[in-house]
Amino acid sequence: MKKMAIACALLSSVVASSVWADAASSLKSRLDKVSSFHATFTQKVTDGSGAAVQEGQGDLWVKRPNLFNWHMTQPDESILVSDGKTLWFYNPFVEQATATWLKDATGNTPFMLIARNQASDWQQYNIKQDGDNFVLTPKASNGNLKQFTINVGRDGTIHQFSAVEQDDQRSAYQLKSQQNGAVDPSKFTFTPPQGVTIDDQRK
């Protein structure tokens, strides 16, 4: 009986691993169908009790695997741009721009996962698929991300995604008017405006 229980446990583990692998493959395959796009987005952040913390909106341009421009326009403007090597974060309000190497950027944030769509990133998660919804749970428990959910159609269109942190704060993003196709290369370059303080962390 004990051997039977052990065998069943091992089988369950193998089946679960297979399901997670299939879900990861399906997610990557769907995202691979669109190499570049532009979309507008709305953001809603709620705390652990469900109370609203912040609402915002902006524009997103992506050219996989390493070019992207995340432009938050409301409530406060901020810009996150990758030119393929350097990751720039610019906050016009405080007039400061931070530069880091893209290769050193964390791969466990929802946006980086979507923009890079690398198999090595998805392997860090247990992934379950329910139709167009994919629920990702980090295999490691030492990060701030508790769960990540993304809704992406068979044609590669991302409809929405959300992230739940360890303190149960939830950030939900809804993408609208996704336009697939070539994106102006200038969207993936950034030149700090004159007078802006630059924090260059590319060491």
From Swiss-Prot:
Pfam family, one: LolA
Alphabetically ordered keywords of this record: Chaperone, Periplasm, Protein transport, Signal, Transport
Any one GO biological process: lipoprotein localization to outer membrane
Top-level division of the source organism's lineage: Bacteria
Keyword Signal on entry: yes
Region Disordered, residue ranges: 178-203
Annotated signal peptide: 1-21
Cell compartment(s), UniProt: Periplasm
Family recorded in the similarity comment: Belongs to the LolA family.
Oligomeric and partner information: Monomer.
Function summary: Participates in the translocation of lipoproteins from the inner membrane to the outer membrane. Only forms a complex with a lipoprotein if the residue after the N-terminal Cys is not an aspartate (The Asp acts as a targeting signal to indicate that the lipoprotein should stay in the inner membrane).
Entry protein name: Outer-membrane lipoprotein carrier protein
